[in-house]
Amino acid sequence: MSNTSNTSETHRTSDAPCQTTKAIHGASIASPQPSRKHQRSLFTLHPLRAWWRNRSLVDVHGWRVSVIAKLPDSSVAMPPPMLAAIAALNLPWKVRDPNTGIVFLLCPPGKCTIGSSSDEDGHKDDETLIACNIKHPFYLAETTTTQEQWERIAGANPSVHVGPKLPVENVSVNDCIAFTRACGPGFRFPHEVEWEYACRAGSDTPFSHAKHLDADIVNYNGRHPYRDGPPGPDRLHTVAAGSMPANSWGFHEMHGNIWEWCVAAATRVALASADGDASVATVMRGGSWANHAHNCRSASRLTRASDYSRKTAGFRLARGI
């Protein structure tokens, strides 16, 4: 069933999400140059730490990391084909970047269908079903970037809801570009195909874990549940990154809590290979604490201007291999 309400009716106007410009190639994204006009002076960049002196670190294609787990353990409900695909890469599954403190999980190449069918409640015209091919492995952060991690690199904290373990928010695309560059070479936004691939974790339902949202395990506006799902609390703020249960691939809060900036292809057709024009819009994925359930679907996407920032807008780091 098509969504009968517009965006302004289904998420709070003051907290709406954005659009920007980015360059991409394959599933690897080259961050665009931020506009000087819109760039905020958030950063007092901290010098990179001398992590190369730590001999306990492991080299992953030129990226020095500490290995947390070589393969997923029984605490992650990962299907056997995914486990086999990760093992075949001969790369550590769970690693920590010593400079930022951010934990990353390995995603192997694979295929997935993104978007939603026309009869999915909340479906929009820009959610056409597309069969996609993830050509290269990549690492994606286990959670959205926290304020503690942001301050470690950037110094200043722009967030409205303040707490070291809470996701950093109220950040624009330009702010996030500056942050990724300060983290070092190779860090970037995830492509929206990569994001949805990791969010769905092999599922084809509106949400990675079910056909409905449970407000006890997803932070969204529980007064507006999905279809005939049960209502729940409206927490009115973010919760700590990693505090909600992970999906079957180990990623936390892919639904709700905070919208996540991602890079989009220039057209829906270009999404099939995660490839597209050098001038593309940046989208937000996942929904937030302020949104109705249908805005938190795996397929849901919103675009805004690159200087847009709100207390519902954050991001999750990625790194190519």
Describe each model-derived feature in a short phrase:
Residues S2-S14:
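Compositionally biased, intrinsically disordered low-complexity segments enriched
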Residues K311-I321:
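Short, structured beta-strand segments at or near domain termini in extracellular proteins/domains
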Residues L105, Y139, P206, E260, ...:
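Residues embedded in well-ordered beta-strands
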Residues W93-S159, V171-N174, G256, V263, ...:
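A short glycine-rich, aromatic-capped structural motif
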Residues G26, S41-L89, W93:
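N-terminal pre-domain segments of enzymes
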Residues T113, S117-D121, S159-V162, P167-L302, ...:
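Functional-site microenvironments in short loops/helix caps that host divalent-cation chemistry
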